[in-house]
Amino acid sequence: MARTTGYYVGSHSGVLGDTPCSVPRPLMGGYPHRMNAFIHDSPQRIESLTNPLVKELRALRTHKGRVEQRRFLAEGERSLAEAAAAGWRAEYLLVAPGAVRGVVPADRLIDVSLEVLEKITGRDNPQPHLAVFAEPDAASRDLGALNARSATRWLMIEAPRDPGNLGSCIRSADATAAGGVILVGDACDPYSIECVRATMGSIFAVQIFRVTRDEAVALLARWPGESVATAADGSVDYVEIAFKAPAMLVIGTEAEGLSSPLRSACTRVARLPMLGRAESVNLAVAAGIFLYAAERAQR
């Protein structure tokens, strides 16, 4: 998880309220989110739904917008407090009338109407706090930055498609002090507003890596601890596994399960017993069960 960014060079013009302003332009390292104070001591104000910044931030609801801007949205006082506790700094903090302002350090503090928050988030009853953060830079998400022995357990998920489920998995990884979450293949965007919302702030505390299936197989081949796949026809009940540290827990989606290459690359294949009529549990539930099973076994 990167918490520092590149240096600045030049600027591009933006509009906050009715007053043009200069907004720092980053180098390739990313956007700023760790400065010592607000750039402006007095907050700006935006009420117009046609303000250029509203359009710019609204684009962050789309994957294309996040890729182009390398930024993402996070909302809610609790989530932003978690960001602050993890050492993150926002580019912008947008605050509704009457809401507390200092929930997270930010380069720009902007007072906005509820209508502006509704426009940006697409929600009828938006949270009174909305912040814009730089995504971690590419180097921090490369497997070269992964230190397997820095944690006793890790979570690998193949092709998760539902942002709510993925957000819950990230939250469970945080709750169990997992070293990080490795997303394999065609995964949904962990920085979508829906996923970030589901993490309840854990997005700021958990390392997230994105890899191809071949990269995941290669990682498992050299993994120094136990790698445990989950499957309905697993050869051993999950409670019987020692989860030798550092343990890599590898799960697939409810609909498709794990691909054969990933399953074959793991040292163990565990099953989660289905005792009733249900054939499976969803991704987030399975991840939570296995993460806590590993935590208990490793005590």
Which ranges hold each PLM region?
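Short beta->alpha connector loops at strand-helix junctions that form conserved
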Residues: 112-113, 158, 184-185, 207, ...
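Structured adenosyl-cofactor binding patch, chiefly the S-adenosyl-L-methionine
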Residues: 131, 172-176, 187-203, 260-299
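N-terminal positively charged helical leader segments and presequences
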Residues: 7, 14-124
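RNA substrate-binding interface of SAM-dependent RNA methyltransferases
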Residues: 31, 137-234
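Active-site/ligand-binding-proximal alpha/beta "capping" segment
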Residues: 229-278
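Short, hydrophobic beta-strand segments that form beta-sheet elements in well-ordered domains
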Residues: 72-74, 91-97, 208, 226-231, ...
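Amphipathic alpha-helical repeat scaffolds
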Residues: 76, 161-169, 280-286
